[in-house]
């Protein structure tokens, strides 16, 4: 009898699930106004779940897997807090202090992750940042091999205590909307520094494009051959070497210590390694799929500005369309063009992966609907990939939203290339978004225009504003021009074309030369991967051998194997 009773007591925990919702359905959340907002979670299989909010109600039935989903009308924007009640039988969840307004998703890499407290000049603004109806949900940095249903985090209102840890770009974007619209604004921030666009895209979507499918295939091959024991042994060897180096560095000058190596990272499975294709989508994007919102803002690209990358005007639309398909909503999507970086260039015709990616960002505007781009080639820092000015990027993103989503009559972008015409030894370039007229920022002649003939030799050009929206470009060195570029460099110092709102013109080119995203020789990549794996095996063997007596047979056997592997390793070295 006791045994039967004990088993019966276990039944609820084995067969029934407690009513629950993801972490982002929590106190202080903001629901998208004037929509049927999706609410979902888990309950007992077959349970009837009801959702009530501000006199409205909705219901859903949990499936065999316990999952349920309901949609509830939110009504107009409302800064008065209300309670969202979810119930199933005797179980009840009360989510307090819920507002109704506009909700946006903020993602990308380090410049989106960059927090307010990293810019000293914002200290005064932070001290005055009491905005009870401006709220942010900050997602933690996590990885996952498979799509996740939940992620930790809490909603926080804007106060001097919370804002220091808010994404600066997202804060200035939300603050601009909040002040202009006078309604609650919520932002869900989910970003991770130093990561490429492919990691924020699902592997299913990546598999539809040849270039990105190759990245997924390479990762899965790496995953299949991953040996945790070998990886751990290699890490232990690296860690021991690092510890030895650090111990030897004690007492050295500060300048010498700057050159010391960083501590090696612990080994991770490829499918759990941040930055790998689809990994951050699974962990940090997928949990939010379906949250009812207006759109997304994006600041990323640094991790893709390199030779060999799949062109960004393919990968960014791939991600945008992937998100829209999963949300079943054509979300507005506004992104920040990369800022200036590196030493200023002084020679025309430079092949530059940074400028090429900036221009590919511009091209996305013409291929992907409901997108916008904040141009920031006037706020960069030659010595820091993280410009401290995050106010301009955030507020320029807000201009796109205020105009295209909220009906404000604004000039919402800097000048964007529209067309070019060659005539009488010169090229006339026409721009969109000129406002009431194009201008020079500093009042001097326009700079950073380049021109070339069929020989593909570039020269600095003379550029003159001609009318409200055109620039006349020519050079005495080029009698028969065929192509023109503007601001074509990672740091086009002196670029000074703006519109009547003071917003800078975007980089552009009319040619398709010097495509630095060269086709990758996959055989070279394969050889490099095999050599890397061989190197790890050698390090692991060396670490194992170091634990043995030099006179032992085991030591001698490992030495022989080590010699053989080293010979093979040297054979695979790249030919000079």
Indicate residue ranges for each PLM-predicted region.
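Hydrophobic alpha-helical transmembrane segments of integral membrane proteins
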Residues: 8-9
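Positively charged n-region of N-terminal signal peptides that target proteins for export
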Residues: 1-4
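Cell-envelope and extracellular/periplasmic
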Residues: 18-566, 570, 575-576
């Amino acid at each position: 009898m006791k045994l039967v009773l004990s088993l019966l007591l276990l039944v609820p925990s084995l067969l029934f699930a407690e009513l629950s919702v993801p972490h982002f359905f929590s106190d202080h959340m903001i629901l998208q106004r004037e929509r049927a907002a999706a609410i979902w979670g888990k309950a007992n299989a077959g349970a009837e779940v009801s959702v009530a909010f501000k006199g409205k109600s909705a219901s859903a039935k949990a499936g065999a897997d316990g999952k349920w989903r309901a949609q509830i009308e939110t009504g107009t924007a409302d800064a008065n807090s209300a309670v969202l009640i979810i119930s199933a039988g005797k179980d009840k969840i009360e989510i307090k202090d819920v507002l109704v307004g506009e909700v946006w998703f903020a993602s990308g890499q380090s410049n989106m992750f960059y927090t307010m407290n990293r810019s000293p000049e914002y200290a005064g603004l932070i001290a005055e940042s009491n905005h009870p109806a401006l709220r942010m949900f900050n997602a933690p940095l996590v990885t996952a091999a498979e799509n996740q249903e939940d992620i930790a985090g809490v909603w926080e209102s804007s106060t001097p205590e919370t804002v220091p840890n808010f994404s600066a770009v997202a804060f200035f974007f939300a603050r601009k909307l909040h002040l202009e619209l006078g309604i609650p604004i919520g932002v869900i921030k989910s970003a991770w520094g130093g990561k490429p666009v492919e990691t924020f895209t699902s592997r299913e979507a990546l598999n539809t494009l040849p270039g990105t499918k190759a990245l997924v295939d390479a990762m899965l091959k790496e995953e299949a051959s991953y040996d945790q024991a070998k990886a751990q042994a290699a890490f232990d060897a690296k860690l021991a070497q690092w510890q030895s180096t650090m111990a030897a560095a004690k007492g050295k000058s500060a300048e010498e210590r700057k050159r010391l190596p960083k501590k090696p990272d612990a080994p991770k499975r490829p499918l759990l390694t941040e930055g790998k294709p689809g990994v951050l989508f699974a962990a940090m994007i997928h949990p939010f799929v379906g949250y009812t919102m207006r759109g997304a803002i994006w600041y990323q690209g640094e991790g893709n500005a390199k030779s060999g990358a799949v062109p960004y005007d393919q990968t960014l639309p791939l991600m945008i369309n992937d998100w829209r398909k999963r949300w079943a909503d054509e979300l507005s999507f506004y992104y920040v063009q990369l800022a200036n970086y590196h030493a200023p260039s002084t020679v025309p015709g430079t092949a530059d992966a940074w400028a090429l990616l900036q221009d590919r960002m511009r091209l996305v505007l013409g291929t992907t609907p409901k997108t916008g781009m904040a141009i920031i080639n006037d706020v960069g820092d030659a010595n820091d990939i993280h410009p401290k000015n995050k106010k301009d990027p955030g507020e320029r993103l807000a201009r796109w939203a205020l105009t295209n989503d909220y009906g404000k009559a604004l000039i919402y972008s800097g000048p964007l290339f529209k067309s070019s015409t060659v005539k009488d030894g010169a090229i006339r370039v026409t721009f969109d978004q000129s406002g009431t007229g194009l201008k020079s920022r500093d009042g001097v002649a326009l700079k950073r225009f380049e021109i070339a003939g069929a020989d593909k030799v570039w020269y600095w050009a003379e550029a003159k504003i001609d009318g409200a929206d055109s620039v006349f470009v020519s050079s005495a060195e080029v009698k028969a021009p065929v192509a023109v570029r503007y601001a074509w460099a990672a740091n086009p110092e002196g670029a000074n074309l703006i519109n009547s709102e003071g917003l800078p013109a975007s980089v552009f080119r009319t040619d398709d030369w010097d495509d630095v995203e060269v086709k990758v020789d996959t055989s070279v990549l394969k050889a490099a991967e095999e050599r890397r794996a061989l190197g790890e095996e050698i390090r692991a063997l060396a670490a194992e051998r170091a634990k043995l007596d030099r006179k032992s047979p085991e030591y001698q056997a490992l030495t022989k194997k080590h010699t053989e592997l080293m010979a093979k390793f040297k054979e695979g070295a790249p030919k000079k």
